[in-house]
Amino acid sequence: MITQRQNDILNLIVELFTQTHEPVGSKALQRTIDSSSATIRNDMAKLEKLGLLEKAHTSSGRMPSPAGFKYFVEHSLRLDSIDEQDIYHVIKTFDFEAFKLEDMLQKASHILAEMTGYTSVILDVEPARQRLTGFDVVQLSNHDALAVMTLDESKPVTVQFAIPRNFLTRDLIAFKAIVEERLLDSSVIDIHYKLRTEIPQIVQKYFVTTDNVLQLFDYVFSELFLETVFVAGKVNSLTYSDLSTYQFLDNEQQVAISLRQSLKEGEMASVQVADSQEAALADVSVLTHKFLIPYRGFGLLSLIGPIDMDYRRSVSLVNIIGKVLAAKLGDYYRYLNSNHYEVH
């Protein structure tokens, strides 16, 4: 355990170092810490012995170690902090016409990446928590059709498929009827379960040959189990990490799994400092924040960057963008649920 003065010294070194990326000496600390230079140097030496500070090779100053950054995050960083200077810029950047949910999520991801110079990832509501609220099949030709699904009464998912060779028009109608009877208004996780239990038994009542029918069910509904992921600033990862992080960001489904694991049950925000279970993220910091998607649940806003990032500003930007995004989404869903022709 460190003393209050040592904690103040560590916090100030973290603040100065993340702004300048230069080692911090006792003289720079004396302007804020009300103690002699010798006392400050003694405390810095103790912090170094504890592994919270490191010596610079080219200077007598000190800089935070990964353990020092982690201590700062766990003991001094407020995860709900907001810097009012950035609010106007974020609101102004969000002033655009969005035609669908994905436009706003992608925009938010780009804004965060551009304002930090790091990598931003945004996830839609977790697939398992969404519900199938609409389903239709549109025959495009004699040989292919389009399954049109609606999740949470607002999110469309379309899957084009080749009509099985032995299918007649009545078979497509039966396929749609089974979905409406057994899967409509079910959660995605329940659909996954029913496809393995109920549906094989039901299909036998409607079809003589069931193999290609069950394959069709699996193909059409497999899209629902995938995370909707928006990555921005991927190239930025090369400036603060190695190629493994850059390549990992290509696997969006695995990225989504890792980010969801970074939040404990019931947590709204977290900061991991070189603490991810994923090897490609083991030497970086990951800030994760839940934001409200009205009527549907929570999305995830994450920032991936270097261990020596400016945590106060990064947390502030994540909070601001999360709040502005939630407000924009609220307006968007209110518009979808309103009478399009009403006079405002």
Curated annotation (Swiss-Prot):
Protein family membership: Belongs to the HrcA family.
HAMAP family: HrcA
The protein's name in its UniProt record: Heat-inducible transcription repressor HrcA
GO MF annotations in UniProt: DNA binding
Keywords: Repressor, Stress response, Transcription, Transcription regulation
The keyword Repressor belongs to this UniProt entry's keyword annotation: yes
Gene name, Swiss-Prot/TrEMBL: hrcA
Gene Ontology BP terms: negative regulation of DNA-templated transcription
Task performed by this protein: Negative regulator of class I heat shock genes (grpE-dnaK-dnaJ and groELS operons). Prevents heat-shock induction of these operons.
Thylakoid in keyword set: no
Gene3D superfamilies from the UniProt entry: 3.30.450.40, Heat-inducible transcription repressor hrca homolog, domain 3, Winged helix-like DNA-binding domain superfamily/Winged helix DNA-binding domain
